[in-house]
Amino acid sequence: MLFESTRGGDKAKTFEEVLLKGLADDGGLYIPTEWPKADIRKLQECNSFIDIAKLIVPLFTESSYKKEEVITLLENTWHDFEKSDLVGIKKVNEDIFIGELFHGPTAAFKDFGLQLCAAFFNKALEKNNQTAIILGATSGDTGSAAIDACKEYKNIKTFMLLPEGNMTDIQRKQMTTVNQENVFVLNINGTFDDCQDIVKSAFKDKSFLKHDQVLLAVNSINWTRIIGQICYYFYLCMKINNFSKQLCFSVPTGNFGNVFACYSELKLVLPVKKIAVAVNENDILHRFFSKNLYKKELVNETLSPSMDITVASNFERLIYDFYLERDAETCKNFFDNFPNSPISLSEDVWKKTYDLFCSSSIGDVETTEIMKKIYKDFNYVVDPHTAVGLCVSKIFGGPISSDLVVLSTAHPGKFLDSLKLAEIPTFEKHHTLSEVLNKEEYSYSLEADQDQVFNFIKRNNH
């Protein structure tokens, strides 16, 4: 199992190379050269999330690590979860299940991918006698999950860029209250896209690194994050019907990594009936899946801030594998020229959308109404992102009438103002969220300027 770039420049890379590089040298994203096949019969014999992970993760890591090494690593990877089996499942009615992915230490689905990344980062760095810098950007949950996953590894320093805007107090304080010498939280006077641009430029520059250091990617472009997310799709299918029936998945998304993990599950073995791409009014993905137009627009602040993104960084993987059938030259041309040139596919190619995907986009008013209805009718509290995912259900006028699994990507306790708007008086608290509100904050303020950020890293890289 080796990996290649979506733009054709990097080929035959090992898992460890892809883990440590994140972004390919040609600007593309890594993807397996061939999709491995999971053993459905062995999956049906699994009893836990860890059992699933022990079958799935080694399919992607064999070029760098023995299976026994990986299994040992996985036994200690996911920690501080509320639930012993990591994922919760809520049956709303006969047609709708909610996959609760928020029981980890930072109350968001990103704990799954980032704890796996951190464990493999540490393994690779120890093996190669290296240290590392993590430079990441966050619109909500990535930063806290990355900081929490990596803070105990002293060979890793984390610098996290926080944009101005719509992050909740709890989301921000999950990062700014971490007081450790290897963690730096930078408040950036700019948008999330400005922060993403600085991170991307860092992987081309790297002048702030010491000679024995590597720069690591924790944003959703890192393939290892995708692997961690693939595992919970298999787990949900095992728990709901033990792989006996096709399911539809509704995925609230911004950067498209969670959607691509669902698509990857399909490529490994599992028949997925439909993937619903659910977004808020930042609707670049909905415009593509409904109108064949992928065009960057200005970002709008919403009640679901983790989806307030105008460019979906993982979308390139789907274009390359699903639509273009691995035509790297065309993919490179599309994304080398984007966002200056919007992307539209030929009609014959784009029509493949109907085979697997549907999409939806809703605003804050509809989001709040869904939160209200779910609480009133089912006595269940969802956060705004999960509400966006629920809009594809037939009970809210959406296209999917049965066998629907909606991913709940964040705990509702992160979004207290949204709960007030939805007139939801009480909810089950998460074990870590209330702790951060009264802690002292530690952070630094910088302009959205790559030189300022790089110089800050240099001054603190000792």
Model-derived regions, located:
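PLP-dependent amino-acid enzyme catalytic core
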Residues: 1-462
